[in-house]
Amino acid sequence: MHAPRFWSGGDGGWPARLLAPAAALYTLATARRMRGTGWRAPVPVLCCGNLTAGGAGKTTVALDLAARLVARGRHVHILTRGYGGRARGPLLVDPARHSAAEVGDEALLLARVAPCHVSADRAAGARAAVAAGADCLVMDDGFQNPGLRQDMGLLVIDGGSGFGNGHVLPAGPLREPVAQGCRRARAAILIGGDRTGALAHLPPALPVLRADLAMQEAAPMLAGRPAIAFAGIGRPDKFFDGLRAQGIRLAACLPFPDHHAYRPRDVRRLSAMAAVQGAVLLTTPKDAVRLPPAIRAQVRSVDVTLAWADPMAPERLLDMWLDKASS
């Protein structure tokens, strides 16, 4: 589903006021749940989380940090809920055998970098990872899940959307109040410019790392042809804007709901549009793994990575995490 418009800014107007009692109950329930004491893993645990519903860049950050740990020679394993997949886990993801319908799109991307375990029960997933030889764990999401104790919690913030209208679900996009979440965080990562003033709501003592999304050059994929871009991610407009910034000639932009399961009718529509326009179909890696096999050969996936403002900042962050966990 798409986020309601009243979540995106201002005070949310009358819909947010109408939903304020439900938001208060949600806040209370979250606070009570977070009082639980989770399982303490025998290895360091880092969580890439956020405070809002929807995409903020958590998976991109998890991929980046896990790749850095692999480069250090660490036996890092990644934990994810497997949103959009049927598997409850714990299940070690095999990209050659599992589909997005089974384990979710994010798990398939994460498994390309390091062993990835899908588990709705984070503690059970951590136990499976440790038994499989993990010497450190990176969680993709799960900041509001108390089942597994975290040595370091990171808040990933999308600079374009920030904290929306500042209200908690369902009155706004927040999973919990900003102040409450910041008390458990060790650092924040701002992706893109702070266009909504989100940083003003963070405690002054909370370290903030800055990064931008770096999109793969798409022009070589097009050979002079126009493109039809489509995406079913948290904020598809970010993907479309990134292509426009490269000067790509977009014949059409088609947003789909986050984690959309592409069906035969979607394939027929995309194929027909590409044929009529003489265009190349462009999408994100997360969408590519959800496509039916019949159309994958027609689609080009445009990768996105992180470009850190301070290239050494993520390395210092990992040092701080590992040093804290070993002390």
Curated annotation (Swiss-Prot):
Pathway annotation from the record: Glycolipid biosynthesis; lipid IV(A) biosynthesis; lipid IV(A) from (3R)-3-hydroxytetradecanoyl-[acyl-carrier-protein] and UDP-N-acetyl-alpha-D-glucosamine: step 6/6
CDD domains, per the entry: SIMIBI
EC number: 2.7.1.130
Pfam families hit by this protein: LpxK
List of residues binding ATP: 52-59
Catalytic activity: a lipid A disaccharide + ATP = a lipid IVA + ADP + H(+)
GO terms under cellular component: plasma membrane
Entry keywords, A to Z: ATP-binding, Kinase, Lipid A biosynthesis, Lipid biosynthesis, Lipid metabolism, Nucleotide-binding, Transferase
MF term (GO), any: ATP binding
GO biological process, one term: lipopolysaccharide core region biosynthetic process
InterPro entries (alphabetical): LpxK, P-loop_NTPase
Claim: Zinc is one of the keywords in the record: no
HAMAP family per the UniProt record, alphabetical: LpxK (MF_00409)
PANTHER family cross-referenced by the UniProt entry: TETRAACYLDISACCHARIDE 4'-KINASE (PTHR42724), TETRAACYLDISACCHARIDE 4'-KINASE, MITOCHONDRIAL-RELATED (PTHR42724:SF1)
NCBIfam families for this protein: lpxK
Record's function text: Transfers the gamma-phosphate of ATP to the 4'-position of a tetraacyldisaccharide 1-phosphate intermediate (termed DS-1-P) to form tetraacyldisaccharide 1,4'-bis-phosphate (lipid IVA).
Similarity section: Belongs to the LpxK family.
Record's protein name: Tetraacyldisaccharide 4'-kinase
Protein source organism: Gluconacetobacter diazotrophicus (strain ATCC 49037 / DSM 5601 / CCUG 37298 / CIP 103539 / LMG 7603 / PAl5)
